């Protein structure tokens, strides 16, 4: 699933020889430019880009140790050799498990998959398939109940045992602010709306599916974002994939970060616009593409582009990195381009008021032309939104496929969003929303800091609630997920093709619902599994100078 020349996908490229622009590499340790400035004592609003930041911007990607990279490639090589051996044994009917053998009646069918994808699925993915699609039978809160299952045919099929694994610490759900629960004011309000309006609308917004709740929600979203108007949609993925084609088309240019989500990739490809990819969060790469676009224009004709649209995300969900929004906005203004910001993971999770990456950097929402986000994460609901100028929203109401053809959002879902958003804004008469935002920030710093102290390689920004812990080797993907579940901790493990082939990882998502006791329990188990599987690859560790309170951030870097 590597991207085509005009495409991109949600993963980070390999760093050749540890060379990274916008940052510095020393002893294989990669730090962003602002983190380097902070280490040198320039900790207030100073970057290499002219002081665009109003706060320190600390983002770290430690380079893969050479020995680990070699052993990872060797691991994949051994698995590949055994895969070919198993294919040989299947061909001659020697292997007992025949699930991967093509049936006689399908011999002449056209292949559904490419050879490598098929080989990878049956010989590598199947070995660790039990780590995914685990069914839960409770609210995805700080703890979940998981249905136990077993496989007697090497993970080709599963049978439920009837047992429930109760009270598993949930480190995988996008429940950033803890609103995914079945009790409380949000749920009570949603239940009342369900009684009054029912579960569904059974129509589109343009017909008879436009409820007063839709109008109330869109006005509230616009106030929350600080924009003129907003429009909501029933599906977050479709908010991107169906609206980008309405904004750009042939004769337009899309500049997309190489790690953008699949929904942005699909929307860009469906639009028919020309697509160019810039290196992840690399402003030199983006500026070069902008300059080339203006100087050379469209291919063959050399006519000016009708529009140039920059696509970025607030928080990148596989890397835990935060977009360099001040620099992106500066380039956008300099070269007269448009900016499309996907805040699926950052809205509610970043900023002193929970208003996302724009709030996090203290920027003006009017500097972002198209503000997109979802309600599936911080708000504990479903759907998405687009915010911006009123003229933009009026245009999308008549030209967006999601607006014209999709069924309207469910009333109880809207009420969940309305109630939780008012809570974040403090309009419910309590400080609960603000406390949740602060608690998430504290949990994030604490969890990241403790993992680094243990010696794990952790990617991303220190303020990002998405925390990737690097596993690297394919065998350790399955082993880590299984060992953590044995210890009553549910985690998400990720490998190729969602990541580069040697950068498999576990991804933790922090929540305001996590108490310090829950985090300490999870960290204790992670530490034990890290020792068991020898996952502590970092050559630099953070060591506490003193025993400090929960929210302190002063730590010393040491090198092994």
Curated annotation (Swiss-Prot):
Keyword Zinc (UniProt): no
Top-level EC class: transferase
PROSITE patterns referenced in this protein's UniProt entry, alphabetically: AA_TRANSFER_CLASS_2
GO MF, any single term: pyridoxal phosphate binding
Residue spans crossing the bilayer: 65-85
Pathways per UniProt: Lipid metabolism; sphingolipid metabolism
Recorded catalytic activity of this chain's protein: L-serine + hexadecanoyl-CoA + H(+) = 3-oxosphinganine + CO2 + CoA; octadecanoyl-CoA + L-serine + H(+) = 3-oxoeicosasphinganine + CO2 + CoA
Membrane topology summary: Single-pass membrane protein
Record protein name field: Serine palmitoyltransferase 2
Chain's role: Component of the serine palmitoyltransferase multisubunit enzyme (SPT) that catalyzes the initial and rate-limiting step in sphingolipid biosynthesis by condensing L-serine and activated acyl-CoA (most commonly palmitoyl-CoA) to form long-chain bases. The SPT complex is composed of SPTLC1, SPTLC2 or SPTLC3 and SPTSSA or SPTSSB. Within this complex, the heterodimer consisting of SPTLC1 and SPTLC2/SPTLC3 forms the catalytic core. The composition of the serine palmitoyltransferase (SPT) complex determines the substrate preference.
GO biological process per UniProt: adipose tissue development; ceramide biosynthetic process; positive regulation of lipophagy; sphinganine biosynthetic process; sphingomyelin biosynthetic process; sphingosine biosynthetic process
Protein's gene: SPTLC2
Modified residues (N6-(pyridoxal phosphate)lysine): 377
Protein family membership: Belongs to the class-II pyridoxal-phosphate-dependent aminotransferase family.
Principal cellular location given in the protein's record: endoplasmic reticulum
Location of the protein in the cell: Endoplasmic reticulum membrane
């Amino acid at each position: 699933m590597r991207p085509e020349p005009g495409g991109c996908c949600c993963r980070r490229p390999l760093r050749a020889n540890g060379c990274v622009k916008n940052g510095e590499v020393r002893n294989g340790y990669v730090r962003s430019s602002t983190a380097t400035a902070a280490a040198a004592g320039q900790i207030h609003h100073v970057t290499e880009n002219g002081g665009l930041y109003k706060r320190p911007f600390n983002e770290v990607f430690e380079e893969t140790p050479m020995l680990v990279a070699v052993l990872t490639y060797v691991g994949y090589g051994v698995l590949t050799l055994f895969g070919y051996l198993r294919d040989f044994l299947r061909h001659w009917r020697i292997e007992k498990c025949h699930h991967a053998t093509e049936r006689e009646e399908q011999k002449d069918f056209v292949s559904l998959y490419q050879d490598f994808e098929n080989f990878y699925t049956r010989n590598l993915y199947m070995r660790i398939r039990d780590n995914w699609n685990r069914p839960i039978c409770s609210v995805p809160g700080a703890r979940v109940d998981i249905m136990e299952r077993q496989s007697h045919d090497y993970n080709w099929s599963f049978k439920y045992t009837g047992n429930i694994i109760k009270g598993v610490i949930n480190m995988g759900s996008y429940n950033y602010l803890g609103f995914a629960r079945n009790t409380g004011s949000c749920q009570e309000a949603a239940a009342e709306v369900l009684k009054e309006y029912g579960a569904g609308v059974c129509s589109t917004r343009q017909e008879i599916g436009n409820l007063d709740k839709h109008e109330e929600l869109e006005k509230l979203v616009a106030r929350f974002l600080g924009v003129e108007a907003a429009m909501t949609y029933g599906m977050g993925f479709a908010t991107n994939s169906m609206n980008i084609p309405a904004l750009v088309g042939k004769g337009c240019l899309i500049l997309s970060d190489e790690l953008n989500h699949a929904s942005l990739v699909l929307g860009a490809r469906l639009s028919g616009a020309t697509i160019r990819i810039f290196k992840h969060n690399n402003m030199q790469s983006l500026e070069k593409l902008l300059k080339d676009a203006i100087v050379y224009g469209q291919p063959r004709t050399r006519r000016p582009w009708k529009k140039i649209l920059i696509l970025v995300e607030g928080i990148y969900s596989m890397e835990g990195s935060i977009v360099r929004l001040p620099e992106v906005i500066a380039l956008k203004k300099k070269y007269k381009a448009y900016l499309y910001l996907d805040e699926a993971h950052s809205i509610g999770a970043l900023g002193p008021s929970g208003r996302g990456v724009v709030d996090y950097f203290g920027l003006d929402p009017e500097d972002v032309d198209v503000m997109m986000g979802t309600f599936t994460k911080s708000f504990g609901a479903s759907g998405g939104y687009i915010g911006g100028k009123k003229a933009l929203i009026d245009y999308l109401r008549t030209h967006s496929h999601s607006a014209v053809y999709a069924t309207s959002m469910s009333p109880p879902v809207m009420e969940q969003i309305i109630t939780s958003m008012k809570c974040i804004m403090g309009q419910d008469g309590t400080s609960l929303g603000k406390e949740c935002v602060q608690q998430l920030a504290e949990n994030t710093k604490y969890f990241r800091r403790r993992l680094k102290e243990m010696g794990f390689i952790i990617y991303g920004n220190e303020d990002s609630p998405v925390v990737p812990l690097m596993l690297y080797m394919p065998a350790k993907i399955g082993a880590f997920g299984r060992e953590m579940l044995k210890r009553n901790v549910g985690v998400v493990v990720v490998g190729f093709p969602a990541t580069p082939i040697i950068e498999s990882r576990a991804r933790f998502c922090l929540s305001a619902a996590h108490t310090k006791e829950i985090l300490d329990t999870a960290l204790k188990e992670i530490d034990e599994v890290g020792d068991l599987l020898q996952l502590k690859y970092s050559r630099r560790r953070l060591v506490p100078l003193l025993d400090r309170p929960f929210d302190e951030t002063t730590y010393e870097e040491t090198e092994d």
